């Protein structure tokens, strides 16, 4: 029921009651007292008012907040959040201590082939310089290391003796102080080894290239520990390639001051401690601690051990049989080549 309908009903009931009260008022005095004496007698005069609930009242004012309760237990840990953005780089810290040296890296790739010339006054590239004699003819008069071109594709750095016997000699072996070990293997003699400022072996592959075209004279110079110098010169010298085991071809003995102890090695192959090519049942290179064109075994052993003069061991020093024999090792020895000349000056 709508509120207005309930109100209208109450109004009608009230009006009816008011009429009855008025009727009672018009009665006489005898009506002033109720005529019923018991509840049962008055039942018919009762009026019972019934109606619909009234309109709800306005909500009251909110009450005061209660006191704070006890702190609850921590809840379970939440899932990790997403990574934030990188912050602004901070200021660089102080420089740390120097670290230890790292491990050696892998070997790099082979570089491009460069200019082999090592002197400030290298000859022009259009000048053909095949050997030390060519350098001498182009005005180079000082002993030292030069670049030559035995072939255009094979530049080579070599030591040139520009003083001895007219100069123009290319030195391929030198002994002078024992600073380099000459008791080495086949591969070492193939490629060459030593130090430019002291002792060296140029390398059998290079010696073969240098002696494979044109006739090369050979000169061997020796000096003992008493300062006495001697030499031997040969009309020609060459060696074969590795397939030929660097076989020696040496010409006639021209002249010298220490007699010949080398031509007996002619026609023999080169031997080292790990490559026995001699005609002996044993390994001559191992027995006499060198590398040479041994047969059964040697008359010269210029790549033997470096002793200071006389030695007790038999024939394993820098020996020259027709010179000071098998028990004396020379202080200095070198072997050098030069293109054959029609006239030579001996010194």
Swiss-Prot record:
Residues 95-115 have a biased composition (Basic and acidic residues). Residues 57-114 form the Collagen-like domain. Coiled coil: none annotated. It is found in: Secreted. CDD domains: FReD. Residues 1-19 form the signal peptide. Disulfide bonds join 132-160, 284-297. SUPFAM superfamilies: Fibrinogen C-terminal domain-like. Its main location: secreted. Pfam families: Collagen, Fibrinogen_C. Residues 121-341 form the Fibrinogen C-terminal domain. PROSITE patterns: FIBRINOGEN_C_1, FIBRINOGEN_C_2. One of its GO terms (biological process) is complement activation, lectin pathway. Expressed by the venom duct. InterPro entries: Collagen, Fibrinogen-like_C, Fibrinogen_a/b/g_C_1, Fibrinogen_a/b/g_C_dom, Fibrinogen_C-term_domain, Fibrinogen_CS. Hydroxylated, possibly at Pro-74 and Pro-94. GO terms for cellular component: extracellular space. GO terms for molecular function: antigen binding; carbohydrate derivative binding; signaling receptor binding; toxin activity. Keywords: Complement system impairing toxin, Disulfide bond, Hemostasis impairing toxin, Hydroxylation, Secreted, Signal, Toxin. Residues 49-115 are annotated as: Disordered. NCBIfam families: GGGWT_bact (NF040941). Belongs to the ficolin lectin family. Veficolin subfamily. Initiates complement activation and/or interferes in platelet aggregation and/or blood coagulation. PANTHER family: FIBRINOGEN/TENASCIN/ANGIOPOEITIN, FICOLIN-3. This is Ryncolin-2.
């Amino acid at each position: 029921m709508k509120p207005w309908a309930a109100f209208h009903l109450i109004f009608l009931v009230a009006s009816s009651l008011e009429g009855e009260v008025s009727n009672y008022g018009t009665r006489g005095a005898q009506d002033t007292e109720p005529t019923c004496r018991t509840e049962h007698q008055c039942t018919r005069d009762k009026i019972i008012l019934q109606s619909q609930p009234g309109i709800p009242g306005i909500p009251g004012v909110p009450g005061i907040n209660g006191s704070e309760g006890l702190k609850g237990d921590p809840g379970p840990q939440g899932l990790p959040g997403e990574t934030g953005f990188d912050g602004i780089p901070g200021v660089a810290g102080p420089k740390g201590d120097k670290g230890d040296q790292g491990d050696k890296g892998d070997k790099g790739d082979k570089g491009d082939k460069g200019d082999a010339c090592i002197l400030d006054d290298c000859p022009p590239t259009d000048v053909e310089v095949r050997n030390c004699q060519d350098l001498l003819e182009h005005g180079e008069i000082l002993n030292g290391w030069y670049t030559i071109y035995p072939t255009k594709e094979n530049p080579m750095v070599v030591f040139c003796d520009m003083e001895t016997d007219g100069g123009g000699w290319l030195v391929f072996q030198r002994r002078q102080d024992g600073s380099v070990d000459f008791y080495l293997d086949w591969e070492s003699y193939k490629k060459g080894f030593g130090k430019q400022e002291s002792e060296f072996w140029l390398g059998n592959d290079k010696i073969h290239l240098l002696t494979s075209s044109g006739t090369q004279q050979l000169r061997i110079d020796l000096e003992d520990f008493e300062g006495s110098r001697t030499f031997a010169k040969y009309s020609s010298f060459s060696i074969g390639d590795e397939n030929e085991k660097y076989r020696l071809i040496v010409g006639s003995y021209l002249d010298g001051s220490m007699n010949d102890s080398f031509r007996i090695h002619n026609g023999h192959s080169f031997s080292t401690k790990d490559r026995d090519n001699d005609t002996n049942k044993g390994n001559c290179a191992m027995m006499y601690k060198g590398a040479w064109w041994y047969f059964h075994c040697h008359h010269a052993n210029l790549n033997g051990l470096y002793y200071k003069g006389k030695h007790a061991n038999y024939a394993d020093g820098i020996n020259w049989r027709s010179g000071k024999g098998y028990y004396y090792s020379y202080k200095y020895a070198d072997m050098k080549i030069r293109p054959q000349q029609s006239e030579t000056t001996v010194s």
